[in-house]
């Protein structure tokens, strides 16, 4: 039984090591009325509507004191940020948390009932792959 337990622990540790550089999943959700931002998954920030997204911030790294964000601005609503819509956050960035917040701002659609100059915010949660969390939980359960 002890051998089996140790073997399970080694397999779990190997799984943790393998998945430590896995891609993080981004989801964008915005329920503000009049906004063209919609729910998006699989790191597709451009699902926040290519013609309407003004700017967004993405976690670039951690400087030891906090998270470093990179801001992409698309004031002309030209959709030029589309090529920057997929990101991989490697574990070697030494970000101590498994989820962090990124902002996503958009202007309302032209046929909405909100003021044309108003803007609404979205929250993007970047969460570590669930398989990695499962492996970590399994490791904790073994000890």
Curated annotation (Swiss-Prot):
Residues 1-22 form the signal peptide. The lineage of its organism: Eukaryota, Amoebozoa, Evosea, Eumycetozoa, Dictyostelia. A lipid is attached at residue 118 (GPI-like-anchor amidated serine). Disruption phenotype: Membranes isolated from axenically grown null cells have no detectable F-actin binding activity. This is Ponticulin. One of its GO terms (biological process) is sorocarp development. GO terms for cellular component: cell-cell junction; Golgi-associated vesicle; microtubule organizing center; plasma membrane; side of membrane. Its main location: membrane. GO terms for molecular function: actin filament binding; carbohydrate binding; cytoskeletal protein-membrane anchor activity. It is found in: Cell membrane. Disulfide bond(s) stabilize the native, actin-binding conformation of ponticulin. The GPI-like-anchor contains a phosphoceramide group, rather than a phosphatidyl group. Keywords: Actin-binding, Cell membrane, Disulfide bond, Glycoprotein, GPI-anchor, Lipoprotein, Membrane, Signal, Transmembrane, Transmembrane beta strand. Monomer. The keyword Signal applies. The keyword Manganese does not apply. It comes from Dictyostelium discoideum (Social amoeba).
């Amino acid at each position: 039984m002890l051998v089996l337990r140790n073997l399970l622990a080694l397999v779990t540790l190997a799984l943790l090591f393998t998945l430590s550089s896995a891609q993080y999943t981004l989801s964008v959700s915005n329920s503000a009325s009049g906004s063209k931002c919609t729910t998006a998954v699989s790191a597709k920030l451009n699902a926040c509507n290519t013609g309407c997204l003004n700017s967004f911030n993405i976690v670039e790294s951690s400087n030891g004191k906090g998270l470093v964000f990179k801001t992409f601005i698309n004031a002309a609503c030209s959709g030029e940020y589309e090529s920057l819509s997929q990101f991989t956050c490697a574990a070697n960035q030494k970000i101590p948390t498994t989820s962090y917040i990124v902002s996503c701002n958009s202007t309302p659609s032209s046929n909405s009932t909100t003021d044309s100059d108003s803007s609404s915010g979205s929250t993007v949660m970047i969460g570590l792959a669930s398989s990695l969390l499962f492996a970590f939980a399994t490791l904790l359960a073994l000890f």
